[in-house]
């Protein structure tokens, strides 16, 4: 990242780019290098936000940041390689953002991963070990690192992407569904923190959960041209829903599951 004074000026200038609640908002995106992350960077930049992406893959992060900058020439979009499995590193990242841009108005959690099995009997607990890190530990670290800064914001939002399977797990998805359910529970606890921090007043910050069946993007369609991907959410539609969380009052989305697919 660059000089903090310059970046705070860029954050103020970003207010002129969009027309909605994200004008000038400073939003961090965890898992910014994947297809969903790329779509989120594009949509948030389009809305006039200052976007700070993080990923563990420097090359794909740089490509995602460059794509968002190219699409929206006046946008401030930066990226940083961060180890979200290390709490201190995650806290340092949150602190750098607030110091350089003056505040943090959002964290979008897009760190993903999937492991499944043919049957419940064939469940491999090594899958759980991996998913616990990707889907739970990164949520724990980002919430603990960012919650106070988000509470200080007048429009703080933490957005988790979850799966319908967390509410209705299938036999072959035991590890994945359990991990998603745990991530949801952790996020809902953060939502209760925001509610209580309001001391009886309407909250200005919120933790919300966007629920999908699964995600689809153009590369998947190209690889499987005959697949219907029924019920899947396109990453661009997900990005639109992410941006929409800021358009609603905090009290309306705090602690809520917002369904982008059919509710079980």
Segments (PLM) and residue ranges:
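Conserved glycine-rich Rossmann-like NAD(P)H-binding loop of the short-chain dehydrogenase/reductase
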Residues: 49-63
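Rossmann-fold scaffold of SDR-type NAD(P)-dependent oxidoreductases
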Residues: 30, 104-112, 135, 160, ...
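Catalytic loop of short-chain dehydrogenase/reductase
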Residues: 151-202, 214
């Amino acid at each position: 990242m660059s000089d903090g004074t310059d970046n705070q000026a860029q954050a103020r200038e970003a207010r002129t780019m969009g027309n909605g609640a994200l004008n000038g908002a400073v939003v961090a995106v965890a898992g910014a290098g994947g297809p969903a992350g790329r779509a989120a960077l594009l949509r948030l930049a389009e809305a006039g936000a200052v976007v700070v992406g993080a990923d563990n893959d420097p090359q794909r992060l740089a490509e995602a940041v460059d794509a968002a900058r190219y699409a929206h020439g006046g946008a401030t979009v930066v990226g940083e390689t961060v180890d979200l499995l290390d709490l201190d590193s995650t806290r340092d990242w949150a602190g750098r953002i607030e110091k350089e841009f003056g505040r943090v108005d959002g964290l979008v959690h897009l760190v993903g991963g999937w492991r499944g099995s043919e049957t419940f009997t064939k469940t491999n607990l090594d899958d759980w070990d991996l998913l616990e890190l990707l889907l739970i530990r990164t949520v724990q670290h980002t919430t603990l690192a960012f919650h106070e800064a988000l509470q200080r914001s007048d429009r703080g939002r933490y957005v988790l992407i979850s799966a319908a399977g967390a509410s209705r797990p299938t036999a072959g998805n035991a590890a994945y569904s359990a991990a998603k359910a745990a991530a949801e529970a952790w996020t809902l606890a953060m939502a209760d923190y925001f509610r209580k921090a309001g001391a009886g007043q309407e909250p200005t910050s919120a933790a919300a959960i966007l629920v999908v069946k699964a995600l689809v993007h153009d590369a998947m369609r190209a690889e499987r041209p005959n697949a219907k991907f029924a019920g899947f959410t396109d990453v661009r539609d997900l990005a639109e829903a992410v941006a929409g969380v800021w358009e609603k009052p905090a009290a309306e989305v705090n602690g809520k599951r917002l369904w982008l697919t059919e509710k079980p």
